[in-house]
């Protein structure tokens, strides 16, 4: 902790600032999908040491990538009410120091990923390459399609977690990757609808801002249909035995479809807030259901 205080600006709590820099809630969800990906693949036949290495690798690569994203987006964050109190915009840590910490975490995380197996390393590296150069630098400020690319970065922890057990890509691993990617788009578009003025003021070309709120709802609705399809495909790949996944994922998806169909005729800010809150636990619940099915199938 003393070392951490040395790289932060005076007057701020080191743990709080680092938690803010690494967007700890979002990072925890990505770490959870990665660990659950490993558990889904292995059921009860996992290696505790691999699980520990994977947890460390996921934590460091996700923290490092997230921190670099915060460094590059600090100017945008300073313009939005929702984000202007983040660590860098409020002056709790400089961009240079934040970048240094983030790069160190990323490099160590990728090194540990490689120790697990090559495919876990590839997943971690792809997560960084998609999120930072492609999403943050090249497309976020230019096109509303940026979040579609960014979503695949968010799916890499689950993809890598699954391959930590299998040692190679599988159709099931791809299902997890794509499920996270499409969920993240539906989720963020409803966040944008709720915080519409913030995104408009910052000049970020998100779908609801560029094409209209109805287009944002329609885009989210299409992605939920894709999520439902992925649940059905996973059920088939599991030999028609993943009943918990089918019931949980099917119910949540159909409920979201019902809600979003109503929003095509208009959605209030409060309704958008309730919907993205409903979307928030979707991934965790579906992944837990998949793990239960994996255990029951043994």
In which residue ranges do the predicted regions lie?
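Intramembrane alpha-helical segments
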Residues: 95-165
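Membrane-embedded alpha-helical segments that form the functional core of polytopic membrane enzymes
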Residues: 32-74, 81-82, 106, 110, ...
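C-terminal ends of transmembrane helices
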Residues: 130-144, 188, 194, 205, ...
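Hydrophobic alpha-helical transmembrane segments in multi-pass integral membrane proteins
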Residues: 159-169, 227-234, 282-298
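Multi-pass membrane catalytic core of lipid/isoprenoid biosynthesis enzymes
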Residues: 82-122, 212-238
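Small-residue-rich segments of transmembrane alpha-helices in multi-pass membrane proteins
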Residues: 32-37, 86-89, 148-165, 214, ...
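Interfacial loop-to-transmembrane junctions
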Residues: 257-285
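Cytosolic, membrane-interface loops and tails of multi-pass inner-membrane proteins
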Residues: 2-13, 72-93, 189-217
């Amino acid at each position: 902790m003393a070392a951490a205080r040395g790289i932060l600006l005076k007057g701020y709590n080191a743990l709080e600032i680092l938690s803010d820099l690494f967007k700890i809630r979002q990072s925890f969800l990505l770490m959870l999908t990665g660990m659950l990906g490993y558990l889904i693949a292995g059921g009860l036949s996992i290696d505790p040491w691999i699980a520990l290495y994977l947890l460390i690798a996921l934590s460091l690569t996700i923290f490092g990538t997230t921190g670099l994203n915060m460094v590059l987006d600090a100017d945008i964050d300073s313009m939005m009410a929702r984000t202007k109190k983040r660590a860098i915009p409020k002056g709790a840590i400089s961009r240079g120091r934040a970048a240094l910490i983030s790069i160190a975490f990323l490099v160590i995380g990728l090194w540990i990923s490689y120790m697990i197996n090559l495919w876990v390393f590839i997943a971690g590296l792809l997560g960084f390459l998609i999120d930072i150069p492609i999403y943050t630098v090249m497309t976020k400020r230019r096109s509303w399609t940026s979040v579609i690319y960014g979503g695949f970065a968010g799916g890499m922890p689950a993809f890598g977690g699954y391959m930590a057990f299998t040692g190679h890509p599988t159709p099931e691993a791809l299902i997890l990757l794509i499920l996270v990617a499409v969920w993240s788009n539906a989720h963020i578009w409803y966040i944008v609808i709720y915080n519409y003025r913030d995104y408009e003021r910052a000049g970020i070309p998100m779908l609801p801002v560029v094409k209209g709120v109805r287009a944002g709802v329609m885009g989210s609705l299409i992605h939920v249909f894709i999520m439902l399809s992925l649940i059905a495909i996973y059920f088939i790949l599991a030999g028609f035995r993943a009943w918990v996944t089918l019931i949980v994922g099917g119910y949540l998806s159909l409920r979201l479809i019902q809600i979003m169909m109503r929003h095509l005729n208009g959605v209030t800010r409060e309704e958008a807030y309730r919907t993205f809150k409903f979307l928030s636990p979707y991934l965790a619940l579906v992944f837990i259901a998949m793990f239960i099915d994996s255990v029951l199938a043994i």
